[in-house]
Amino acid sequence: MLTNSSLTVYHKVEIDHDYKWARYFYKNIWWFGGKGSSTNKGYDNANDVQIRIPYDLNPDLDYNNFGIGDILVQGEHKDITSEQDIQGEYYNITSLNNNVFGNNRHIHIGGK
């Protein structure tokens, strides 16, 4: 699988009736999409991102480290305590698929 970027994921974890953001970094990912406009759909679909994270290029990849609503930031970023700590553009996971069949095993993420 071709890769063109890296990704930081902030996964929301509940601990003792409180939430914390667990940070996961993946060096080899395929990123497509981003902020912009479309002549047909306006800002609706133009803000979507599609991300594929190959298992063979990310040895610590675990499907359980992702959830709907988690935060996606392109590139490598530091730990956070809240969403307000994020500098720049970020997306939330809206769809999540674990594609483990065939020769091209990967996690496919949709974000908005």
List each model region and its residues.
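Short, conserved turn/kink motifs that form compact alpha/beta structural patches or helix kinks used as
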Residues: 20-112
